[in-house]
Swiss-Prot record:
Keywords: Cytoplasm, Metal-binding, Zinc. This is Protein SprT. SMART domains: SprT. Zn(2+) binds at residues 69, 73. Binds 1 zinc ion. Belongs to the SprT family. One of its GO terms (molecular function) is zinc ion binding. Pfam families: SprT-like (PF10263). It is found in: Cytoplasm. The keyword Transmembrane helix does not apply. One of its GO terms (biological process) is response to stress. Its cofactor is Zn(2+). The active site is at residue 70.
Amino acid sequence: MPDQLNSRVETCYQQAEAFFKRTFKRPVVSFQLRGQKAGVAHLHENLLRFNPQLYKENAEDFLRQTVPHEVAHLIAHQLFGGSIQPHGEEWQLIMRGVYELPPNRCHTYAVKRRSVIRYIYRCPCPDSDFPFTAQRHGMVRKGRRYLCRRCREPLVFSGETRTE
């Protein structure tokens, strides 16, 4: 899986070098990205991070659009410095001029939402389910208290969880 992507990164750099007639420092490429982002360019670290799940599900478009998109950020930074806008004129110039691609800001890949566990808290009021996030549940375990707005009694963990 990473071989094709690494090869595409190298091809993008070679295209940029031919276009600008200069060399560019190659980045470190990582597959340590999760969530909704397909890729991230870390300008000061000269690092590209890619989402392996989105790559696997959208390989063709990922190689055609996402990889040049992220490489263009690093090229723009090396050419124009840190005072440019992330998807500004300079980046767009590279997308259109070097890669002959539309300068799309965001991908349209289907992103699966992960299931979320809710911890059910209750008070004496009838029908008083309060679904807490894992973070809020953790705060209660550390001693934080939450009160019902109706009866002003503390909310107590019922022992139940719900997956959404």
